[in-house]
Amino acid sequence: MSQALTLARPYGRAAFAIAREGGNFAPWSDALAFSAQVAGDPRVAALLLNPALGQEQAVTLLAPPQAGEDYLRFLGVLADAQRLSLLPEVAGLYEQLRAEAEHVVKATVTSAAAMSQTELDTIAAALKKRFGRDVDITTAVDASLIGGAVIDTGDVVIDGSLKGKLARLQSSLAH
């Protein structure tokens, strides 16, 4: 996995530079997300390894219908280098660079039950105060947490779940 990220990093940076130059972050995000999802499918991944599949066919397969010329050239470069399988990692790196440029922290809040909008607003305000940036929250539900929530911003994980507290208590009692 770390090797894939290492190989994908220059392509993620290149995609970001092209999008920044054109001032069109959102279309590139959408296009990369589409291509990453298609490339991540095991059947498509196997097809991409088939030597009978030409570069143009691979680009056509992975490009969204609304893709611009710059994006098609970018996919062509990936195809030339036989790096189309790295599209999920490239898309992830691109999104990290975009969030940094737009001064946004992306956070995933996983809770034991669905949270109200008021609770999410409170968490967003606290995270904005802590990081000094706008916050883009994605929610998930995991009943195994028992109660509370886990907030993951990529670099920082705040585990306020009952499951996490019980695990920490068990660990401290064991030692």
From Swiss-Prot:
Keywords of the record: ATP synthesis, Cell inner membrane, Cell membrane, CF(1), Hydrogen ion transport, Ion transport, Membrane, Transport
Main localization, broad class: membrane
Single GO molecular function: proton-transporting ATP synthase activity, rotational mechanism
Location of the protein in the cell: Cell inner membrane
GO CC terms of this entry: plasma membrane; proton-transporting ATP synthase complex
Membrane topology, from the record: Peripheral membrane protein
Role this protein plays: F(1)F(0) ATP synthase produces ATP from ADP in the presence of a proton or sodium gradient. F-type ATPases consist of two structural domains, F(1) containing the extramembraneous catalytic core and F(0) containing the membrane proton channel, linked together by a central stalk and a peripheral stalk. During catalysis, ATP synthesis in the catalytic domain of F(1) is coupled via a rotary mechanism of the central stalk subunits to proton translocation.
Subunit structure and binding partners: F-type ATPases have 2 components, F(1) - the catalytic core - and F(0) - the membrane proton channel. F(1) has five subunits: alpha(3), beta(3), gamma(1), delta(1), epsilon(1). F(0) has three main subunits: a(1), b(2) and c(10-14). The alpha and beta chains form an alternating ring which encloses part of the gamma chain. F(1) is attached to F(0) by a central stalk formed by the gamma and epsilon chains, while a peripheral stalk is formed by the delta and b chains.
Family label: Belongs to the ATPase delta chain family.
Protein name according to UniProt: ATP synthase subunit delta
Organism name: Xanthomonas euvesicatoria pv. vesicatoria (strain 85-10) (Xanthomonas campestris pv. vesicatoria)
